[in-house]
C-alpha cells in the first residue's frame, strides 16, 4: 500500500528547457496544426506540453516515486490538470520545476480492494521565482485482487 507519510514530500528542483523542435514534435504527435505551435521563431508550447516534464527530471526524482511504495503492476493514470498563471511558455524558455506530493487518500474499489490515490503537483517557475504554471496529476493504485 502507498506510503501516506509522503504527503508534503518535495522532489529535487530541475530545469526544463522548452525547445522549439520538441514543441513542434509534440504538436504534430497530438495532431495539432496550430501555427502558434509550429512557428519557427517563437513557438508557443501547447497546454499539455508540460506532460513531457517526466523526461527532464533528474534520476534522483525517481526516489520520490520509489518512496511512495506504489505497486507499479496496479498503477493507473487517473487525472491530469494544468493551470497557467501566465501565458504558456514559448520556445527558448527555461522553466524551473519541482514536484510535491500534495495528497494521498483511499477509496473502496467496486471490484474489490482499497484504491490509493496519489495527487502530485509540479510547479513551474521563471527565473524570478514566479509560478508560471502548475501540473497536477493523480495516480491510482488499484486494489489488490483477492
Predicted regions and their residues:
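Hot-dog-fold acyl-thioester-processing enzymes
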Residues: 1-79
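HotDog/MaoC-like acyl-thioester-processing domains
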Residues: 1-2, 84-146
Amino acid at each position: 500500500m502507498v506510503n501516506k507519510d509522503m504527503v508534503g514530500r518535495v522532489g529535487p528542483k530541475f530545469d526544463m528547457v522548452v525547445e522549439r523542435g520538441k514543441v513542434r514534435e509534440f504538436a504534430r504527435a497530438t495532431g495539432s496544426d496550430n501555427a502558434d505551435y509550429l512557428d519557427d521563431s517563437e513557438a508557443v508550447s501547447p497546454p499539455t506540453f508540460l506532460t513531457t516534464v517526466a523526461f527532464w527530471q533528474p534520476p534522483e526524482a525517481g526516489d520520490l516515486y520509489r518512496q511512495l511504495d506504489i505497486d507499479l503492476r496496479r498503477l493507473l493514470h487517473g487525472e491530469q490538470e494544468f493551470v497557467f498563471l501566465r501565458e504558456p511558455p514559448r520556445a527558448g524558455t527555461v522553466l524551473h520545476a519541482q514536484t510535491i506530493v500534495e495528497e494521498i487518500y483511499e477509496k473502496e474499489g467496486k471490484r474489490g480492494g482499497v484504491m490509493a490515490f496519489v495527487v502530485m503537483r509540479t510547479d513551474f517557475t521563471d527565473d524570478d521565482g514566479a509560478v508560471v504554471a502548475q501540473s497536477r496529476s493523480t495516480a491510482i493504485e488499484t486494489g489488490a485482487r483477492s
